[in-house]
Amino acid sequence: MLHPSASKHLWLALSPHGYGHAAMTAPVIQALRRRRPELRLTIQTALPRSFLDERYGSDFVHVPEIPDFGLKMLSATNVDLDASAEGYRRLHADFIGLVEGEAARLRDARPDAVVANVPYATLAAAARAGIPAVALSSLNWADMYRHYLGDRPEAAAIWAEMRDAYDSARAFLRATPAMEMPSIGNVVDIGTVARRGRNRRDELPGPAAARLGLVAFGGIDHDLSMARWPRLEGWTWASAQDCPPERDDILSWRELGLPFADLVASVDVIVTKPGYGTFTEAGLSGVPVLYVARPDWPESPAMDLWLMAHTRALAVTVEEMLGDLESQLRTLFSLPSQDVAQAMGNEEAAEFIDRLLLAEVGTCESS
């Protein structure tokens, strides 16, 4: 339903833990803006404005300071446990004061509603300021914290503040696929939130018979150097990593001039790690995925099963991939095709947020 004359202000807080939280939220905001073309948007995140412009357009106010950090990482797949624990000790040393400071920021901005993917301090601040708020994500930092750091002496007190902050929201919209969330008492399950890319292979340079792969490990550097990447006859690789100048078969994905979701839909294979954005965009396009298994990551079981249900997918180790990439690709391409996914969660989340902007949403029962 359109509300063309009702200009509402939405505050969107995004975890800067890689690019996935911002990427998965963008199609929801696009769906919301179709309902509310006059929506005023503020995005609070430490992510670069240039990336946000690619996903959200330029019509928003950017607040680049946010207390949330998610987890400190050694690489795209390895958590720095000690640095993460220290980060949370500092964040919670005066959590009440931190929340009050963020609440004052919200009071000054006067948004009609807050959406968080998935900074919990922002949710606690919204509750403190009396502003309706909702969480949206496939993970939450309370259960992530307990999984990786729950044995630390300070963990019980920190986890309790995280849990209470999440539970202060009107609901936690858990996007499919998602981790189990035993800490969260207000979960509402929704469908997949993602953008379906458009296959634009005919716009890309090079001979039509050439094979094109995308190597993308998200917004956090991977410990895999592209200088070690195997050279395969007939293949060119678009990479989000640094491209070695001596390799004529590797180029930056940005040189191809396509939005990331369109590039995902245009390649022959994606090489990646388990991550909501890349997995779901691949599942919506049916593009085969070769990925580095991540058994310690709590999202992985659900994401792996979902991906295998919607496209050909094969989990490998870095050593297997670098040792015999051609054989791994042959195995991947021999798997049966699957039915591509649908992104039903975009409109489901937009409908919930639209009602939240009108303060028509009450506290939701756990699903």
Residues of each region from the PLM?
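A donor-sugar binding/catalytic signature common to diverse glycosyltransferases
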Residues: 113-117, 259-302
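Short amphipathic alpha-helix
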Residues: 22-32
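Conserved nucleotide-sugar donor-interacting segment of glycosyltransferase catalytic cores
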Residues: 98-163
